Amino acid sequence: MQEIIKCREQLEKAIKDGEFDKALECLKNAKNFKITKDLLKSTDIGKSVGKLRAHKDIGISSQSKELIDKWKQDIEGTSATTTSSSSSSSSSTTSTTTTKTASPSESLKRKSISEDTSDRPTSKPLLQENKKISPPTTPKTSSPPIASLIAPITGANADLRNKTIQLFVEALTTDNDETMSPPEDIAVEIEAEMYDIYRGVSKEYKEKLRSFKFNLKKNDILRLSLLNRQISVAKFCSMDIYSMASDDLKEERKKLDKFNTEASMLGQNNEATTDQFQCGKCKQRKCTYTQLQTRSADEPPTTFVKCCVKGCGNRWRFC
């Protein structure tokens, strides 16, 4: 028990200090322990390892899942063995007690019966026939769920690439577990496709990462389509911001396009007059607006609006 407690303390310290290599070593050493249900409760190692299944480091989360599954199998196997041995011991004790408590008269009766039937042909007992008909059953154990394990990338830019995969895993994770592919597999494929397209971790690679992560978090339909293989990874990596946008965002952009085309007048600063915006201060719809590209080129422009009502002059902006 002391070894398990020491391993748990070392694991918690390594996680707290950010020493992930030491944490992985502790998880691997924990596989050698003979774990029981009582040990998990008394040492609290089950709680410590269970929390790490959702850790940001892929290696630690994978090893934690693997270790929990192994412990489940060990505990189920121990429970089945204990039940079998206790039932066997109980039946043996009952048989012995019955034999010892038999009265002398019953012994004489059995002796006389055996003498009368000694000349008869012997036959197999009915109990043996029944045993042949119904063979002994073995307790069934549920197989552990198959966890998706990701081998960390090594070589040039390994840290950045592994971080990219982790960000994609977070963006792809949903409450729906019944998907064709786990988020980890899709994240690895997207990163590999981006790395090939942009020939390394370039400026374009990083810009695309930010754009993909933003749109995946905002668009549930796009996220599920990727996880269910309704959209291929290659097609996803070739999509622009307009293709990845959710239906609500597409509708909003259509309105902005309409505002641009229906603008009645342009000022010196390229300001368009419209009645499509309502001022939050005076509640009137006399406004001018202009659009500027304040962020990267693959993101929508920022719209600046000014109320034209005399005495108001309220200003606001939105993306």
Swiss-Prot record:
Residues 1-78 form the TFIIS N-terminal domain. SUPFAM superfamilies: Conserved domain common to transcription factors TFIIS, elongin A, CRSP70 (SSF47676), Elongation factor TFIIS domain 2 (SSF46942), Zinc beta-ribbon (SSF57783). It is found in: Nucleus. GO terms for cellular component: nucleus. It comes from the Eukaryota. Pfam families: Med26 (PF08711), TFIIS_M (PF07500), Zn_ribbon_TFIIS (PF01096). Zn(2+) binds at C279, C282, C307, C312. Residues 107-122 have a biased composition (Basic and acidic residues). Its main location: nucleus. Residues 160-272 form the TFIIS central domain. InterPro entries: TF_IIS-typ (IPR035100), TFIIS/CRSP70_N_sub (IPR003617), TFIIS/LEDGF_dom_sf (IPR035441), TFIIS_cen_dom (IPR003618), TFIIS_cen_dom_sf (IPR036575), TFIIS_N (IPR017923), Znf_TFIIS (IPR001222). Residues 78-106, 133-146 have a biased composition (Low complexity). GO terms for biological process: regulation of transcription by RNA polymerase II; transcription elongation by RNA polymerase II. GO terms for molecular function: RNA polymerase II transcription regulatory region sequence-specific DNA binding; zinc ion binding. A zinc finger (TFIIS-type) spans 275-317. Residues 78-146 are annotated as: Disordered. Keywords: DNA-binding, Metal-binding, Nucleus, Transcription, Transcription regulation, Zinc, Zinc-finger. Necessary for efficient RNA polymerase II transcription elongation past template-encoded arresting sites. The arresting sites in DNA have the property of trapping a certain fraction of elongating RNA polymerases that pass through, resulting in locked ternary complexes. Cleavage of the nascent transcript by S-II allows the resumption of elongation from the new 3'-terminus. Belongs to the TFS-II family. PANTHER family: IP08861P-RELATED (PTHR11477:SF0), TRANSCRIPTION FACTOR S-II ZINC FINGER DOMAIN-CONTAINING PROTEIN (PTHR11477). This is Transcription elongation factor A protein 1. The lineage of its organism: Eukaryota, Amoebozoa, Evosea, Eumycetozoa, Dictyostelia.
